[in-house]
A protein has these predicted regions:
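Short low-complexity stretches enriched in small and charged residues
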Residues: 18-26, 107, 158-168, 204-206, ...
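Beta-propeller and closely related beta-pinwheel folds
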Residues: 37-49, 82-93, 124-284
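Generic structural signal for short, solvent-exposed loop/turn connectors between secondary structure elements
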Residues: 118-137, 196-200, 205, 383-390, ...
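Conserved beta-strand positions in repeat-built beta-propeller and related beta-rich domains
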Residues: 65-68, 108-112, 148-151, 202-204, ...
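Hydrophobic or amphipathic alpha-helical targeting/insertion segments
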Residues: 96-130
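Beta-sheet repeat architectures centered on beta-propellers
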Residues: 1-80, 90-104, 228-244, 250-485
Length: 485
């Protein structure tokens, strides 16, 4: 079997150790799994969504919040409308909402012009400005403090400043009182990301710093554990905690482990990404983790996306493999699924057959971590029918130093209970300087063979899969040598 190996678009197609195309799939330890499309969840906001966040109340109820340029919204779990719970905000094109939870308080920020907003679970029905708090691009919770970075207050903006609340008090920000304070981090550019936990991680354009609590009088120490290198794209950060922080720099994709940055895209996808990125729209990049599939995803506008995000780069951090998906969206986010009843299912579809997510899915049970996306000003979940997948093998040479004829291909794609639709194309060329010519797509017959025919010296096989399937592993070919040319 010729496997669908690791997707390595930065390497040569000929004898590539992996796959040359892996589109609309999730990388697995062996082969690939389907990538789900979008399922519409909410009604529309006023403008495109710039952030989605979900948390649970003490009784288990899922609370979902979202924000656009001028408003914050709360999802109504009965009719899935987006109810405005605060308005009058000012966000420029490069700003997204950032949310954190501290005790029963949900805190939102992201603008240079608007003070942090607070919502007390079980008490409040709207967000309100937190008195004395700054406006901030980035938020996190570090130990017993709400921490902000890249802040604006008292009519001044401090791009390299970290400021935090009083200890165990998200509503109190008086500097010098109850350990509330700030710290400027010099000579490292703007702060572009902030991650909380037992210690904090401050990502900057030219450095990464650890924020460690030490108590009075210093409160926190800031140690630059990495200098001369940092995160250059403010909306490209997602984490599983301070020891597993994913981000994008000018030289590619990295994971920070709490002490150092490890390249995860070098000689794999970095060149592909920067060649594909619409560089004039980098402010539309977003990043989120899908814990169910153990992947981190970067949504971005490609050169064919007219400045809007239309592609997602997918990294499986468990097996350290990549893939890509074509998915139009506004923003990516990690959230929770609300619980559904028979009545609320009617708001998703007028019939069971019209539901894009299987009724067997835990999506309907509620409370599970879920990858979400904004599209058409609405919240969507990434739980729909599988997108049409395209996988392509490495380029191989069946007959050394001579032409060969491919007479048929057997794809190894598994399925549980339904039969997916599959077609196969063979791409062939006689010289490495030529572009491959692909045969007409041929369907799988009853003999488990796709009778595709193509001649050349170098071949690759493309498999197109639609419908419901489980794993795509690789292919076998029926090839015979021909005379030298």
């Amino acid at each position: 079997m010729i496997p669908f190996g690791e997707w390595l678009p930065d390497q040569s197609d000929f004898q590539n150790p992996g796959a040359t195309i892996a589109t609309n799939v999730i990388p697995a330890a062996r082969g690939y799994r389907p990538f789900a499309g979008l399922t519409e969840l909410s009604a529309a906001a006023t403008d495109r969504l710039r952030g989605i966040y979900a948390t649970k109340a003490s009784d288990g109820t899922v609370l979902t919040f979202a924000g656009d340029q001028g408003k914050l919204y709360k999802l109504d779990n009965s009719d899935f409308s987006l109810d405005s719970v605060a308005s009058g905000f000012t966000m420029t094109s490069d700003m997204n909402w950032d949310f954190v939870r501290f005790g029963d308080e949900v805190i939102a920020g992201g603008s240079d012009a608007d003070t942090l907003q607070g919502f007390t679970i079980g008490t409040d029905s709207t967000f309100s400005a937190i008195s004395g708090a700054p406006a901030a691009r980035h938020l996190a919770v570090v130990r017993d403090f709400v921490v902000t970075a890249n802040v604006t207050y008292s009519s001044n903006t401090y791009r390299s400043r970290v400021r935090w609340s009083q200890i165990n008090d998200a509503a109190s920000w008086t500097l010098g009182s109850a350990q509330a304070d700030f710290q400027d981090i010099a000579d490292a550019g703007d702060i572009t990301g902030l991650v909380g936990g037992e210690f904090g991680v401050v990502l900057m354009e030219k450095a990464i710093a650890r924020m460690q609590y030490v108590g009075s009088p210093l409160i926190f120490t800031f140690e630059k554990v990495e200098t001369g290198h940092g995160c250059n794209y403010p909306n490209s950060v997602a984490s599983l905690g301070p020891t597993q922080v994913f981000y994008l720099a000018d030289d590619g994709f990295f994971m920070f482990d709490g002490q150092r940055s490890i390249p995860i895209g070098s000689e794999k996808v970095d060149r592909f990404f920067f060649d594909d990125l619409a560089i004039g729209s980098v402010d539309r990049i977003s990043c989120a983790i899908d814990p169910e599939n153990q992947v981190v995803m970067w949504g971005y506008p490609s050169l064919s996306g007219a400045g809007n995000p239309d592609r997602v780069l997918i990294y499986n951090y468990a097996v350290q493999r990549w893939s890509v998906a074509d998915l139009e969206h506004e923003v990516l986010a990690s959230s929770l699924t609300p619980a559904f009843s028979v009545e609320t299912l009617d708001t998703l579809s007028s019939s069971l057959d019209g539901l894009t997510t299987s009724l067997d899915s835990r999506f309907y049970a509620g409370g599970f971590f879920q990858l979400s996306a904004g599209k058409d000003k609405k919240i969507h979940t990434v739980t729909g029918a599988p997108l049409d997948a395209v996988l392509e093998t490495t380029e191989f040479e069946p007959a050394t130093m001579r032409q060969s004829l491919i007479r048929g291909v057997t794809p190894y794609v598994t399925s549980r209970s339904t039969t997916p639709t599959m077609t196969v194309q063979v791409g062939s060329r006689s010289r490495q300087i030529d572009s491959p010519s692909f045969s007409t797509a041929v369907s799988l017959n009853d003999d488990n063979n796709c009778p595709a025919r193509s001649s050349g010296r170098y071949h690759r096989v493309r498999v197109n899969v639609s419908g419901t399937w489980r794993y795509a592993l690789g292919i076998d070919v029926d090839a015979v040598g021909m005379g030298k040319r």
